Amino acid sequence: MLGRRIFSPAPNRGFILCNLIQSNNSTRRGFSDNRKFNERNSEASSNVGFQRRVRSNIPSYLSASVEEGDIYSPNDLLFETVKAKNQAKFYEPVREDCFKTVNENPMNYWKNPVILSRFVTELGRIKPRGDTGLTAKNQRLLSRAIRRARAAGIMPTKYKSVYSEN
């Protein structure tokens, strides 16, 4: 099937680009057929926004969880109330930076694979800052210390150290 594009004026919409698919026998439609098609298409396109809003999926964590038989007040169904309840669920306490609490520099521990292996995965990759709970500066210094220990041959590169605490 071949398609052609027709610009047709629609009321209060400007020009609408319509894709018309020719029939299987590949005959051209007359002008009156195109006008009827474009009028029907413009009526359908005026409802598109409404249909899109109705069909939009609201995430489950933003909708109130009310089941049959529950007693609720209208305030429980407000968006702000539901959002506040869900934010409380996802809250995680901030982890403390262990190097900052003892006021030490992670670079001082590059010769100690037991301490450094706490910040390495089983496959030898340096854990990200979200997992370690370190500040950005100490995470940077720690990764530098781990790389230095690997270059010196103190720590393995492809797996976690056998002599680690964990």
Swiss-Prot record:
GO terms for biological process: mitochondrial translation; translation. Residues 1-31 form a transit peptide. It is found in: Mitochondrion. It comes from the Eukaryota. Residues 29-48 are annotated as: Disordered. GO terms for cellular component: mitochondrial small ribosomal subunit; mitochondrion. Keywords: Mitochondrion, Ribonucleoprotein, Ribosomal protein, Transit peptide. Disulfide bonds: none annotated. Residues 30-42 have a biased composition (Basic and acidic residues). The keyword Aminoacyl-tRNA synthetase does not apply. InterPro entries: Ribosomal_bS18, Ribosomal_bS18_sf. Gene3D superfamilies: Ribosomal protein S18. Pfam families: Ribosomal_S18. One of its GO terms (molecular function) is structural constituent of ribosome. Component of the mitochondrial small ribosomal subunit (mt-SSU). Mature yeast 74S mitochondrial ribosomes consist of a small (37S) and a large (54S) subunit. The 37S small subunit contains a 15S ribosomal RNA (15S mt-rRNA) and at least 32 different proteins. The 54S large subunit contains a 21S rRNA (21S mt-rRNA) and at least 45 different proteins. Belongs to the bacterial ribosomal protein bS18 family. Component of the mitochondrial ribosome (mitoribosome), a dedicated translation machinery responsible for the synthesis of mitochondrial genome-encoded proteins, including at least some of the essential transmembrane subunits of the mitochondrial respiratory chain. The mitoribosomes are attached to the mitochondrial inner membrane and translation products are cotranslationally integrated into the membrane. This is Small ribosomal subunit protein bS18m. It comes from Schizosaccharomyces pombe (strain 972 / ATCC 24843) (Fission yeast). The lineage of its organism: Eukaryota, Fungi, Dikarya, Ascomycota, Taphrinomycotina.
